[in-house]
Amino acid sequence: MKFSEMWIREWINPPISSIELADQLTMAGFKVNELKPVTNIFYGVVIGEIVECKMHPNLHNVWITKVNNGDNKLLNIVCNAPNCRKNIRVAVAQIGAMLPDGRKIKLKTIQGKQSEGILCTFSALGITSHTVGIIELPINAPIGENFYNYLRLNDNIIEINITPNRGDCLSVIGISREIAAINHLKLKKIKIESIIPTINDIIPISIEVPDTCPQFFGRILKNIHITSPTPLWIAEKLRRCGICSVNIVIDIVNYVLLELGHPIHVFDYKKIDGNIIRIRFSKIGEILTLSDNNSLKLLPNTIVISDCKKPLSIAGTITPNKYSICSETRHIILQSAFFTPSVIASQSTLYHMHDLYSFHYARGVDPSISKLALDRVTSLLIRSCGGYPGPIINMTNKSMLPKPTNIILHRTKLDKIIGFHILDSEITHILKRLGFQTEFSDNIWKILPPTWRFDISIEENLIAEITRIHGYNNIPCVSLCTNFITDRSHASTIPLSRIKNLLIDRGYQEIMTYSFVNYNIQKLLHPQKIPLILKNPITSEMSTMRLSLWSGLIKTVIYNQNRQQKQMKLFESGICFIPQKNAENQVNQDLMIAGIRSGLRFNEHWDLTKVCPVDFYDIKGDVEALLNITNKLHCIRFKKYTHPALHSGQSAAIYLKNICIGYIGMIHPTIQMKLNLRSQVLVFELSWNMISQFTLPKITTISKFPKNFRDISIIVPNKVASESVIIECKKIANEDQLIDIKLSDVYTGQNIAKGFKSFTIRLFFQSKTHTLKEEEISDIVNKCSIILKKRFHGTLR
């Protein structure tokens, strides 16, 4: 959500800086993503009036104007804006003025005509990125006044994250309430002038789904001037909140939505048949005619707003339809309703209509301000574009409206959960500042939440609120007291941070993704597994619980490759949810650690003439380095394995002795193509519980005798893995003589038959007691050669 800091300060103005305000919001649970000025500083721009406007004699669609800027002399200014005309108030950058982009205005001659400044657009002043035409100000804008001060541009735009449970904060007044509570201040009361009906026109309301729409207010407003310009102060506040101006009616409705957090539906009164509004279920095969004359086939049991013949809109959404207002509208119907949040959330997902209205309704709006919001819109419309209001039509079923319930808060439970003591008076004060009705006696608070706090239903919610407003940074640092005695012999558990640090040292970056993942991506990676499906997902992109960490890693790679990132090394640790009937709650929750690599092996460098993409052996090396920390790398085996998500020729299961602990490989080319991955992607995933224990290393004597090595080159069938060859050799001699074996070369091609390959393994010899003789070394080499030829049907080269 974006909002103007100055708009907030109209409601509550704490004596703190903008940065301190942003920090307060973040610490209160509303993370501030961005704090930026409305525009960069500029000077020398004043309000002027065009008193003369003539066509340039030498240029087409260019005007020569005389502008009154409040001085004795009129300015001659050349302008090519399409809306340049006589008798409008404009923003004039005079000679010597400095614009936000650093340009300084100088006297210019354009095709023989001098220009003593420029007439500014919003984009020239850095207020918007793109505009057509010069700024037009109200006719009562004071000539000669500093434009920066007139438009109150010493303002900041604050963008914050609102969690799904805090629908009450999707408005300026909602955020202001929080700031008031944090700073021990009182919020200004909402003052809406009462609307006296001047006409008697009403429209009957029929609510046929009272459980979904228990409250509905309506009003007819006649003879409005919809072509009236939107007041600059409204248009500016909307713009600073990221909403473009449309027309006076839509702008005022959006303004009240941002201000109070309550949507208002508007319909053209002349397009209503039968002089009735019905809130009902859609009928089978029913069609909603959209504004572009296309048709939307309604699904059965969709809640719609209709007249006696046809549906006008899907309830709780902005549906651009044929019955909305247009430039010829004179009479309108204003509607302010309460809809059950879960129903609107479901409908907006079904129809893929995620707009401002559904966003608010799905999170819950305060039913106690429905009439207030309607009066606020009516008042602003009458003031800005005229009109004659009718009486309010009220259809409210109080028994169906959500009601706050009393919650009991116990002193003992509060202290136990938060771990420190807050004074009784401070707790009561915090709750009252948040709008809760509070009674305290015998270490128990009896609390009634306000109507706008749908998220408060249990004692733990209250404890979280008290801690949040008290301030997480005010929680005292107290050492944990425990009677446990640490057994120092249990030093064989590796901290997860050790693994993370190793991966970071190898160039990886840690990411954190949601446990809720995209069903389609997960289905591609694990087609044979059935995940846990969420009944009420946040979005359709987060509808299942993850079976592995690969879904989140791959989605992150896709996001970054679309932003021109050529090399990615990412890892994540987290819980995966594997359905299993005999497990607790029928699901296993396994802690996994996974990584992904994509793109180039190395960053671009002038000394690297050859561009090398990352391959299987790069990520295998990372996994081996990770597993080496466990001191069990000698027990690790990479066995060929066909995983549905991985390339059959470049994948393996990772075994610790005889237990599978994870998988590694390249993403299958088919999946790579379906997900639009532009370069080959390699992944690994390991079970943390399987690798978190390590074997304490043994202290061994360092040999003072020389080391020797010998090579064995053997031709074997392609299906033989080098690891199998090395294992067979290790069985022949003990570690006192044959200390290590490495694969030094793999060759196919000339002089090697088709279907075969040549391995060269290097055997390292060293004794701790004496210098090995040639006979001892040759004896081991010969034994290895014989067993390899016999075991793998090989031929020595």
UniProtKB/Swiss-Prot annotation:
Molecular-function GO terms, alphabetical: ATP binding; magnesium ion binding; phenylalanine-tRNA ligase activity; tRNA binding
Q: tRNA-binding domain: which residues?
A: 39-148
**Start and end residues of each FDX-ACB domain:** 703-797
Its localization reads: Cytoplasm
tRNA-binding among keywords: yes
The record's listing under Gene3D superfamilies reads: 3.30.56.10, Bira Bifunctional Protein, Domain 2, Ferrodoxin-fold anticodon-binding domain, Nucleic acid-binding proteins, Phenylalanyl-trna Synthetase, Chain B, domain 3
Q: Which reaction does it catalyse?
A: tRNA(Phe) + L-phenylalanine + ATP = L-phenylalanyl-tRNA(Phe) + AMP + diphosphate + H(+)
Please identify the protein, giving its name as recorded. Phenylalanine--tRNA ligase beta subunit
